[in-house]
Amino acid sequence: MASRGTTETSKLKQNLEEQLDRLMQQLQDLEECREELDADEYEETKKETLEQLSEINDSLKKIMSGDMTLVDELSGMQLAIQAAISQAFKTPEVIRMFAKKQPRQLRTRLAEMDRDLMVGKLGRDLYTQQKVEILTALRKLGEKLTQDDETFLSANAGAALSQFEKVSSDLGSGDKVFALASFEVEKAKQ
């Protein structure tokens, strides 16, 4: 791959993004249809999806160990997988926008949520959870948060999001991040 150049790298990245999108959509659909499924069916489908995420994680690990030029581009996708597996983020839509590095779409979603809260279309608990996820994703993407957003995040960030943020900041190399994600995958399977 390295000898051929950017075309193959681009195609590989596109394929991995498409697989990640499919799995994130599958998680989102699963959450939306949770009421229609019995508990065993829900858990089995979720387990299968997490296993597929684990397989993508393993593929990314192999790619990153063999081709360091992919590290920067794939690290965002890997962090998104880590977040999904560790369940720091509960909203697949947020995970998808984070993986694709789409801060503008995240901010648009935040504005929509503010509106939905005002008109009573969105409950306070769900609003708080999703706003914390979006603000954390924006921060991880290097976006500047307002003082109000920082205060909201400090007051409402849960342990899982704090741990995700700490780990993703502390780990510099892709190998360490992958090692942690692999650990989280194994933990999620148990």
UniProtKB/Swiss-Prot annotation:
PANTHER family: BETA-CATENIN-INTERACTING PROTEIN 1 (PTHR47142:SF1)
Quaternary structure and interacting proteins, as annotated: Does not interact with CTNNB1.
Domain of life: Eukaryota
Record SUPFAM superfamilies: beta-catenin-interacting protein ICAT
Coiled-coil stretches: 6-64
Similarity annotation: Belongs to the CTNNBIP1 family.
Signal peptide range: none
Pfam (any one): ICAT
Keyword Coiled coil listed: yes
Record InterPro entries: ICAT_dom, ICAT_sf
Keyword Coiled coil: yes
Gene Ontology molecular-function annotations: beta-catenin binding
Gene3D superfamilies for the chain: Beta-catenin-interacting ICAT
Keywords, comma-separated and alphabetical: Coiled coil
Organism in which the protein naturally occurs: Gallus gallus (Chicken)
Protein's UniProt name: Protein LZIC
